[in-house]
């Protein structure tokens, strides 16, 4: 079985560091599926669910990413995410409340910095909601 090293890092912390046999990353071009020995590429990450197939695990490892940069090398994938949260740490009610607060922050922003922070918070909330929707739609 071929494996690759995967690093998912946000500004706050390392979210995942380990091996994977397959990874799906939400990019601005669409969802990108990556197997070991993939051609080198770089892409912008869009808000959504990053999915990892990990050796020895029967369930995918899910991480909500709000944006960032993806770098793929034949034996390593690195995702530098603006914000990243593991699925186990997510809560739908909190994510929906965060989305409402971010939308209010966008409409009430008094300067560019406040507007940028509100957009970042909105992207993080949307990423969590998309990940939670993926989990709900794939429950058995």
Swiss-Prot record:
Matches recorded under CDD domains: F1-ATPase_delta
SUPFAM superfamilies: Epsilon subunit of F1F0-ATP synthase C-terminal domain, Epsilon subunit of F1F0-ATP synthase N-terminal domain
Location in or out of the cell: Cell inner membrane
Lineage: superkingdom: Bacteria
Gene Ontology CC entries for this record: plasma membrane; proton-transporting ATP synthase complex
GO function terms (MF aspect): ATP binding; proton-transporting ATP synthase activity, rotational mechanism
Ranges that cross the membrane: none
Membrane topology recorded in Swiss-Prot or TrEMBL: Peripheral membrane protein
Subunit structure as annotated in this protein's UniProt entry: F-type ATPases have 2 components, CF(1) - the catalytic core - and CF(0) - the membrane proton channel. CF(1) has five subunits: alpha(3), beta(3), gamma(1), delta(1), epsilon(1). CF(0) has three main subunits: a, b and c.
Record's function text: Produces ATP from ADP in the presence of a proton gradient across the membrane.
Family per similarity comment: Belongs to the ATPase epsilon chain family.
Protein's name in the database: ATP synthase epsilon chain
Organism this protein belongs to: Neisseria gonorrhoeae (strain ATCC 700825 / FA 1090)
